[in-house]
Design a protein with these regions (language model features):
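N-terminal "arm"/small-domain region of PLP-dependent enzymes with the aminotransferase-like
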Residues: 1-57, 152-155
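Conserved core of the PLP fold type I
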Residues: 55-171
Length: 171
């Protein structure tokens, strides 16, 4: 949909086109994270219990209990942990906060598709780096690029959609 009200970043976006959606009865579509099994009895019991424990109220907007638990678990100070309303919000804040718009952002050419969307929304130019023949991120390709010439690097680990992880030593 076009509008004179869209920003340049939004006007340049293309609608998401889902992958093939076969219309075969009882087919489990793993590409859309469907599961052939029903929830376990323990999951159903946990859902029922949660429904009776204030689920109708908004949660703590600062997620203080979760933030403290994550900080404690990872041996960090609370100020070193960021909690958001899902990965979309966290990624949007990261793109807005960390990437200088005058420089390109590096990312794998095959990766999580929304990285490019966030970059477009925030006016950040993207520069893709090809995966190697085995569909693996080669960190040497990134190390060969002058760090001062880019806004940063964004890499999903494990990579989406290939599922290949980079070792902590390589990161």
């Amino acid at each position: 949909m076009e509008s004179v009200f869209w920003s340049d970043g939004v006007a340049g976006l293309h609608p998401y086109v889902p992958g093939e959606q076969p219309q075969i009865a009882n087919l489990v579509k793993l590409n859309t994270n469907e599961n052939p099994f029903p929830p376990s009895e323990q999951v159903l019991a946990a859902i029922a219990a949660a429904a009776q424990s204030g689920l109708q109220r908004y949660p703590d907007p600062q997620s203080a209990e979760l933030l403290q638990a994550l900080a404690t678990y990872h041996g960090l100070e609370n100020g070193n942990v960021f909690v958001g309303n899902g990965s979309d919000e966290v990624l949007a804040h990261a793109f807005r906060a960390f990437y200088v718009k005058q420089k390109p952002l590096l990312m794998p050419d095959i990766s999580y598709s929304f990285y490019g969307v966030y970059a477009a929304l925030f006016g950040i130019t993207c520069q893709t780096v090809a995966l190697n023949a085995d569909l693996v991120v080669d960190v040497n390709d990134y190390l060969a690029i002058d760090a001062d010439s880019v806004a940063g690097v964004v890499i999903a680990n494990p990579n989406a959609p290939t599922g290949v992880a980079i070792s902590l030593a390589d990161i």
